[in-house]
Design a protein with these regions (language model features):
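Extended acidic/charged loop-beta regions that coordinate divalent cations
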Residues: 1-52
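Membrane-targeting and insertion segments and their boundary/processing signals
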Residues: 41-45, 59, 94, 152
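Glycine/charged-rich beta-loop-alpha catalytic/anionic-binding loops adjacent to active sites
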Residues: 48-57, 102-107
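General secondary-structure propensity
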Residues: 53-61, 191-193
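Short glycine/threonine-rich catalytic loop with a Thr-x-Gly-x-Asp
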Residues: 59-70, 96-97
Length: 243
């Protein structure tokens, strides 16, 4: 197995093989001086071809710094000048459901799509970044676009919620599976509520919030579409095709 000097996200990091000497190749494009600001976004310096430019993105989380760097690497390879790349990053806004922000009953709310273990881990780290226990609505479906097999939930590090989640309202087709996963992650029984109806799940999450406290909505793909449909009917978000 690889040995890591630093592991940043999943299997990504500064690695080498102690046996054969294989190692991460030198970077053509990278991010340095990364500063994460929770749901407020991130700042970092994009380094490419001997040039460096300071960037701010509204996209939260280290995983989105990786996404920005990957997109920058692709367009730089096509010959787009770095200043144009930097301007595009600064003007970018997230797609619906991906770190989407809204206000529900006077509270800030954030929707963070999660589709696989590595992504869900980063979503959880981002939601927990300010150090306060959170209130979350976790919506899990198992339709074709989500993946029929939900055993991947056992590969997500939900244990990080064990003492940092004041309430988790689980909903969606596989709400009970999610509740079982949280039980074995160490969440107290009183901290997990099963509410199969997505609209009522949102309501129960909001009702549990204290003044100024945000709600984190963590859905799989089709659950995200269902939740946004409910929120759009209430006039809280645009319908997807209007974004």
């Amino acid at each position: 197995p690889y040995a890591y000097r630093a592991a940043y996200l999943g299997h990504l990091g500064e690695y080498h093989c102690p046996s054969c000497g294989t190692a991460r190749p030198p970077l053509d494009v990278g991010a340095v001086e990364v500063r994460l600001a929770g749901m407020a976004g991130s700042t970092f310096v994009l380094a490419a071809g001997g040039q460096r430019v300071a960037l701010t993105t509204v996209l939260p989380g280290l995983y989105n710094v990786y996404n920005v760097v990957a997109a920058a690497a692709a367009v730089l390879a096509l010959g787009i000048p770095l200043p144009i790349v930097a301007a595009a990053v600064r003007e970018f806004t997230p797609a619906f459901g991906r770190a989407e922000s809204m206000t529900i009953a006077g509270h800030p709310a954030y929707m963070l799509l999660a589709k696989n273990p590595a992504g869900f881990n980063e979503v959880l780290r981002t939601a927990l970044a300010d150090g306060r226990p959170i209130v979350a609505v976790i919506a899990i479906n198992d339709l074709t676009a989500d993946g029929r097999d939900v055993s991947w939930l056992w590969d997500v590090d939900f244990e990080m919620l064990s003492d940092r989640c004041r309430l988790a309202v689980v909903t969606g087709i596989r709400a009970h599976d999610m509740a079982v996963r949280l039980k074995y992650a160490g969440l107290p029984q009183a901290a997990v509520v099963v509410e199969p109806d997505e609209g009522w799940a949102l309501r129960r999450g909001v009702e549990a919030l204290r003044a100024g406290e945000p709600l984190y909505v963590l859905p799989t793909y089709t659950a995200m579409l269902r939740l946004r449909h409910i929120l759009a009917r209430r006039g809280l978000v645009h319908t997807s095709w209007e974004d």
